[in-house]
């Protein structure tokens, strides 16, 4: 909870599994408590779907998250990728371990989406 007290915003990764949705409700409750008491400026940056595979279950979870959270759900998803798992064992971030890996491309796409959202938010606040 300390980190949420000091943060401006939080990016919430959501594993594309149903049990993750249960944990998500607990996290959202914690964020609400922090926002109502210790840090009223805390915002949710967005919900990032992770460990995504193209199967029915993952598609259902992704659809639920997008329907429930709307524009707060990032368009970018982080696909399950072996290179993402290998990179830490080599002491490297995935971008340095294998820049062409699906996971690297996904994270680069996420970075671009974040920048685009923040530029848009900055314009709207002026």
Language-model region placement:
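Short, contiguous clusters of charged residues that form electrostatic/catalytic patches at enzyme active sites
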Residues: 25, 29, 105-112
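Short, glycine-rich, amphipathic interfacial segments at transmembrane boundaries or analogous
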Residues: 80-88
